[in-house]
Amino acid sequence: MQIKRFGFLAFLLAFSFSWAANASNQHGDEHGHHEEQDEKSIKEQIAEVKEHHLKDSHSFHLWGDHASGTSVEFPLPIILWDEGELHFFMSSAFHHSENQTVESKGSYFRLYHSKIYKTDAEGTIHYDEEHHATNAKPIDFSITKTVFSTILVGILLLWLFGAVAKKYRKDPVPRGIAKFMEPLVILVRDDIAKPNIGEKDYKRFMPYLLTVFFFIWMANMIGQTPLGINITGNIAVTMGLALITFFLTQFSGRKDYWAHIFWMPGVPYLMRVILMPIEILGLFVKPFSLMIRLYANILAGHVVIMSIISLIFIFGNWFATGAFFGLTFFLSIIELLVAFLQAYIFTMLSALYFGSAVEVHDEHH
């Protein structure tokens, strides 16, 4: 029992330390060439580190700095479509030239502020009056950090559920990983699907509800690692999940569901006319709220923890280091709860929308 408790505490400490290690490593890279960037204050450097962590990128940055030539990173595939031609190379190619320009089939591309632009051989970037890049951009199908991480989570889910199914085929009594997964599956079924959708219809929605629950939870947990993966802190990911829920809801809608939207029964005719645009607007507000809720909560968690870690470097003393590290450890434990809670809430609301779409109303007039 003591070994299990120690393992659990070590697990929590590892997650907490991962944040501090990641932030201190990136800040250390900035500090290493501080003499070359005297014009930048420590707050400006910290802001750059935060932006680097929160934004998507074309590689996994591990440690080091591009400016000093010490950067170590895991490159990802760059896939571009430009003027009828497909261009393919690894993201590391951008950092092998002095101006970060890559030549492919007679065209030149440059990675600038996490976006790829067409340039000349010198990598010239043109700007407008507001200092925004005006170069043409190819159609980018690249495997970015978020895309790679999403695929990785999908593979892990396939392996996880495949292993559970294999164990159940051999022995109906849950053992090993199946023993861990069964309570979570029952949680989704008995606490989310059945109460919100109903005994009659819940089974056809269970595959999606289980998938979205475990995907969000696992993505959020991976976001606690020092790799800087922030899957559900990317609004494109949360929008995709919300749209799937939206389309499943609309395609599952029965006659009563559409009747309550376009011609609300049981109310005066004038009120029906007033309620119709409100109900139609509600169709799109629901997925929008799903998207923003998940995105904002996860993004805010990353920002808060990185901000607290940054205070260590701003104050620059041992007392601040101990105090803020302790606070970071506490907030990291809270983030583990938030990771699960956001998966639960998204799944719960999705089931609630499905239930409203398939519900049959007994109206008596």
Report residues per predicted region.
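Perimembrane topogenic segments of multi-pass inner/organellar membrane proteins
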Residues: Q2-I3, W19-P174
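Alpha-helical transmembrane segments
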Residues: K4-A10, V147, I151, F205-L209, ...
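Bacterial N-terminal signal peptides
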Residues: L9-S18
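Cytosolic juxtamembrane amphipathic/interface segments immediately preceding
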Residues: A133-P138, V188-D201
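Membrane-embedded alpha-helical core segments of multi-pass
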Residues: L152, L156, V185-R189, L210, ...
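Hydrophobic transmembrane alpha-helix segments characteristic of membrane transport
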Residues: L158-N196, D256
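Hydrophobic alpha-helical transmembrane segments and adjacent short intramembrane/lumenal linkers
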Residues: D191, F205-M206, T211-F214, M218-T225, ...
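Membrane-interface helix caps and helix-loop-helix hairpins in membrane proteins
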Residues: T225-I231
